Regions:
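Ala/Thr-enriched low-complexity intrinsically disordered regions
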Residues: 16, 20, 41, 53, ...
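Intrinsic disorder/low-complexity segments
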Residues: 22, 29-30
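Short, Lys/Arg-enriched N-terminal segments with co-localized hydrophobic residues
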Residues: 48-66
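Glycoside hydrolase catalytic-domain context in secreted enzymes
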Residues: 62-743, 747-765, 769-775
Length: 775
């Protein structure tokens, strides 16, 4: 047997090094041979452990994806399914968490061999895993965690910028590194599954969860989603979970989990493409949304789950409901007559695992026994769950676990530092940045200057449902803006006054103290925005203007005559009229994570040149939303009678401490057809005296289309370094199929005709070349 194992291992190594068709066929043959030689690895009443690890390659390439679900691999799952009882199968379809189940019920599922556990960390996960070893089938559980911007529910793990903040980097390769680093920390903590990335479209900024999105553009979201998914999945450390499928962020009135009134054509045009990209990148799981699509609950939407996601997109992983979605079909949405009906509809519609609907287990068993729920559907769901568990190596007794020391490691902090720097966006600069001389005295003012909870945003250990009593402050290194300023400007006197609270009416004494401090300083750094209570699930806002007395604070600081540098710490875009008028410089950090304050201070000092650009539009007034850039043209443009036309800050906007000049825009061919890939080229010159990185944005406009299309749609981008005084030649690939539209019959087609291809550093500075698409 040892000889056979050695042969198999060598062939696998050969396959990894030489990924040819020959090797693929050979490995399939050898896998069948392995089954014949070692049938005990498939089934039987002995422990179901694989004698040596069969490390399946990443799904980042098509052939690897195919191998991961090879017939031999599926044969193992079939044998396990054949031996499982109904009760054991349904247990695999149940996810439980300690905060939502009574202790005795939670313990019961531990002993039953529950399929998944949520919000169980470290040693607690090890204990649950040990319980699974004592069950008859010994099927390992999969542990899920909300790792939205790092393994952030664990105090001591690296907390990265929020998804919206990191999207400002427009840097897929860096975001992929962040995903891999997060996977390592989650894996080291004994967990296997991250509920990330969020692929909702953040177009209505009243919605409370905009901070969790990659912004408003499907192309950018899809690109970044694919990158972070590859980072999570490529080493088999954790499974990614794409959420929330689908249209969740577009609910009526931006109220969380309400109905979303969008057509199937709009779903295919705007909301489905990011999921398609992430599925192609190898995502193992998908989570359904709370809400409904035109009155049909997503949990019960058979067309979108079975026909579109599983059949059309070829998604082979498993679908998990969101929190208590099965029960909510009855209690909130009134879409079923009973909880049992909810269970039946959920499974029939294509959900494979129920999250925290505690009655799912008993009802599902009874429904199958009564012939009201097909065993075939149960087997399909469990197969998908087992498939993911096999792909993660959970059945392997030598499952790869990263060392605990990687949690909060220096390497991960360095990734965070780089990503946070690239996530900051310079919105305004009247020549004050970078500070030319070290100030003698700096006044740091504002309610968010020293509030790490506000800086972190949602989904950190502060909001963990089972937070340890001692977790009142971060264990790792963190920098609020105040601490960052004190660190970077160590030779300056730095004094702080809060000035006001973010919400509610603040006493005049607070305001007066801040103004007095500002009058005595050489420069004022004001840190304002929003706090955790104003962002997150169920925290939707009707008013996006600054809350409390923050606007008044900025006006009074400006009246002192001192330079005012305003730093925004906020989850999502706000209306900033007074702030812009009364600031000499304006920096957007969104929720900057551990190092948001440090990087803001470094930018102010000129230690790096900001390169971030907005992935989302800023409204001028609350009544203007949604104001995303790629809307259809209307009869009367986008103007209101009482608000200036257009957004306050456009999608793709962001300043630098240098200037870039675009010249010589060309396209490799002025006619093309479906399937062609063209090259769009431009020369970029850094005309300033500071090195920098520029995000080159490419858009298209279909000049005549069979349905309405936006006048500008993102179809490519590239981040390039340009030294001071240097000129860089930039080439952008343009896949002609990316210019397709979804017609009135919900078909994706490429309309022949005339197109404009536009390239520039922002929507306001685009240059154009012509392209004709032929039949």
């Amino acid at each position: 047997m040892g000889v056979l194992q050695e042969i198999f291992s060598k062939i696998k190594n050969f396959y990894t090094e030489f990924s040819t068709e020959y090797c693929k066929i050979l490995l399939n043959v050898v896998e069948y041979f392995h089954i014949l030689c070692f049938p005990h690895t498939l089934c039987g009443k002995i422990p179901r452990k694989i004698p040596f690890a069969i490390k399946m390659p990443s799904r980042t390439a098509d052939w690897r994806y195919i191998m991961k679900i090879s017939m031999a691999y599926e044969a193992r799952i079939s044998e396990i399914l054949a031996e499982m009882t109904l009760e054991e199968k349904i247990a695999q379809m149940q996810q439980v968490s300690p905060e939502s189940f009574r202790p005795e019920v939670f313990e019961r599922f531990r002993k039953l061999g529950g399929g998944s556990f949520l919000h169980v960390l470290g040693k607690d996960a090890d204990a649950v895993r040990a319980d699974a070893e004592n069950t008859r089938m010994k099927i390992p559980p999969i542990f899920g965690i909300d790792a939205i911007h790092g393994h952030s529910l664990l105090n001591g793990a690296v907390i990265y910028p929020s998804q919206l903040a990191m999207a400002c980097s427009w840097n897929p390769s860096l975001i992929k590194k962040m995903g891999k680093a997060t996977a390592e920390e989650v894996n080291a903590d004994g967990l296997d599954w991250v509920f990330s990335p969020v692929l909702c479209i953040g177009r209505d900024t009243r919605w409370g969860r905009v901070d969790e999105t990659f912004g408003e553009d499907p192309y950018l979201i899809g690109t970044l989603a694919a990158a972070i998914t590859e980072g999570y999945e490529e080493d088999g450390l954790v499974a990614a979970c794409l959420k929330h499928y689908i249209g969740y962020g577009e609910a009526t009135g931006a109220r969380d989990a309400y109905d979303t009134e969008i057509s199937m054509r709009k779903i295919r045009e705007v909301f489905l493409p990011p999921f398609r990209r992430a599925v192609e990148a190898g995502a193992s799981t998908v989570m359904t949304a709370y809400g409904s699509i035109s009155g049909v609950p997503m949990t019960a939407h058979r067309q979108l789950l079975r026909e579109v996601l599983k059949d059309e997109l070829g998604f082979d992983g498993f679908v998990v409901t969101d929190w208590y979605n099965v029960g909510s079909l009855r209690t909130k949405q009134k879409a079923v007559e009973s909880f049992a009906d909810g269970v039946r509809v959920t499974v029939e519609s294509g959900n494979d695992m129920s999250m925290n609907s505690y009655q799912f287990y008993e009802h599902a068993i009874r429904l199958v026994n009564e012939g009201k729920l097909s065993m075939e559907l149960i087997d399909e769901a469990v197969r998908r769950i087992l498939r993911v568990k096999f792909s993660l190596g959970l059945f392997d007794e030598n499952k790869k676990r990263m060392p605990k020391e990687c949690i909060g490691s220096k390497e991960h902090i360095e990734i965070n530092h780089a990503l946070t720097r690239e996530s900051l966006v310079l919105l305004e600069n009247n020549g004050v940045l970078p500070l030319k001389e070290t100030p003698k005295k700096i006044a740091v003012v504002g309610p968010n200057a020293d509030d790490i909870r506000a800086q972190y945003g949602d989904w950190t250990f502060f909001s963990h449902p089972n937070r340890a009593p001692e977790d009142t402050m971060p264990k790792g290194d963190y920098y609020t803006v105040l601490r960052g300023i004190k660190t970077v400007f160590a030779d300056s006197e730095v004094a702080y006054a809060k000035g006001c609270d973010v919400m509610g009416y603040s006493a005049d004494t607070m305001m007066n103290e801040a103004i007095s401090l500002a009058q005595s300083a050489d420069v004022v750094i004001a840190v304002i925005g929003a706090i955790l209570a104003q962002n997150g699930e169920g925290k939707d806002r009707a008013v996006l203007e600054l809350s409390g007395r923050q606007g008044e604070l900025i006006r009074k600081l400006k009246a002192t005559g001192k330079p005012v540098i305003t730093v925004l710490v906020n989850g999502k875009p706000l209306c900033l009229g007074d702030v812009i008028e009364n600031s000499d410089a304006l920096i957007e950090t969104f929720n900057g994570g551990d190092l948001g304050g440090l990087c803001a201070a470094e930018m102010i000092a000129g230690k790096f040149n900001p390169s971030g650009k907005l992935p989302i539009s800023f409204p001028r007034a609350s009544g203007q939303v949604p104001c995303y850039y790629n809307q259809y043209a209307g009869w009367h443009a986008t103007k209101y009678m009482d608000v200036d036309e257009g957004s306050l800050y456009d999608f793709g906007y962001g300043l630098s401490l240098t200037n870039y000049e675009y010249k010589n825009l060309t396209i490799s061919a002025d006619t093309a057809k479906a399937g062609d890939v063209l090259t769009v080229s431009v020369d970029i010159t850094n005309t300033g005296d500071m090195d920098g990185a520029e995000i080159v944005e490419m858009y298209y406009n279909d000049l005549y289309s069979s349905v309405l299309t936006p006048t500008r749609q993102l179809c490519g981008f590239k981040k390039v370094f340009v030294g001071a005084g240097e000129t860089v030649h930039v080439e952008l690939p343009l896949a002609v199929n990316d210019l397709s539209l979804v017609n009135a019959n919900c078909e994706t087609v490429l309309d022949p005709g005339d197109f404009e291809i536009m390239v520039g550093g922002s929507l306001a500075t685009l240059q154009t070349v012509a392209l004709k698409i032929t039949e």
